[in-house]
Amino acid sequence: MAKRHLTRRQSWRIEKIQEERAARAARRELRAVDELEGGDLGPEQTGQVIAHFGVQVEVESADGQVSRCHLRANLPALVTGDQVVWRAGNQGIGVIVAQLPRRSELCRPDMRGLLKPVAANVDRIVIVFAPRPEPHANLIDRYLIAAEHAGIQPLLLLNKADLVDESNAEGIDALLNVYRTLGYPLIEVSAFNGLAMDELRGALDGHVSVFVGQSGVGKSSLVNALLPGVDTRVGDLSTVTGKGTHTTTTARLFHFPGGGDLIDSPGIREFGLGHVSRDDVEAGFIEFRDLLGHCRFRDCKHDREPGCALLQALEDGRIMPQRMASYRHILASMPETDY
């Protein structure tokens, strides 16, 4: 079926209806909070947001008890992984009264281009890709830039390693060698047959991790393999496009038996970088770092300028051609105002 193209007026009407519905839901929540705070609430205690449902969240207390909570109107936007102060209610529903400072946050632009946090207090971003759908270095590099920009340690994870065969082995090996050469940690696993899953468990224990990657690469299947008994609605590849169908709808936090947490967030096909500048993109390519600032011209675009340190490193073999091509492709996709 062809994609429906909306007129500007139709898009405006849809957006207005959604805003009105959100406003009504917010008013209902405010009334609920007022009623709770007018009654008996327990003492303040700390907890962690383990799931977000729009106007309500699930909070886990220090003793492992999970409660549904309303949000005070003056709170900033909360995301899964946030540490909060909350008060329990006598009807089983509590109230979030404060957000504690974040150690880190992972953000990406929403459909309007506005920066939106998607997970908090993460210290490892696991970039999942697979032989099918076909992996692209450009998308992996976008995730790496986001991780470097946020100061979060990346881990590259090739899932569905059992699908590597004669038809794709050469391309997969070449892709993996690029990132191994750069020094990024990389694990090849299969949630299907259990290949190297113990190695992955060891890499995740003791960390707060988030899985990112295209739909169809098996993020939900990995969660099911790592945490038996947890159902995260696994979807199949689209037979028409070969891309994954979106399955996981709500970011959730899970605990590993040996310590550490996993935040499983919705799959995305394209990861925008509208919130980073050209300088941020350059810094996200770790092999560029020692070269930046050493070009002949301060405003060097690293294209054809004489005395460019990056072009010289490319010629000398210190920068791989495919990485330079990916860098240029990412810059070309950014708004010109960010140059």
UniProtKB/Swiss-Prot annotation:
Major localization listed first in the record, in broad terms: cytoplasm
Listed EC numbers: 3.6.1.-
MF terms (GO), sorted A to Z: GTP binding; GTPase activity; metal ion binding; rRNA binding
Cofactor(s) needed: Zn(2+)
Coiled coil (residue ranges): none
A biological process from GO: ribosomal small subunit biogenesis
This protein's GO CC annotations: cytoplasm
Binding site for Zn(2+): 295, 300, 302, 308
CDD domains hit by this protein: YjeQ_EngC
InterPro entries: G_CP_dom (IPR030378), NA-bd_OB-fold (IPR012340), P-loop_NTPase (IPR027417), Ribosome_biogen_GTPase_RsgA (IPR004881), RsgA_GTPase_dom (IPR010914)
Binding residue positions for GTP: 159-162, 213-221
Cofactor remark: Binds 1 zinc ion per subunit.
Subcellular location per the Swiss-Prot or TrEMBL entry: Cytoplasm
UniProt subunit comment: Monomer. Associates with 30S ribosomal subunit, binds 16S rRNA.
Function: One of several proteins that assist in the late maturation steps of the functional core of the 30S ribosomal subunit. Helps release RbfA from mature subunits. May play a role in the assembly of ribosomal proteins into the subunit. Circularly permuted GTPase that catalyzes slow GTP hydrolysis, GTPase activity is stimulated by the 30S ribosomal subunit.
Family label: Belongs to the TRAFAC class YlqF/YawG GTPase family. RsgA subfamily.
Stated name of the protein: Small ribosomal subunit biogenesis GTPase RsgA
Gene name of the record: rsgA
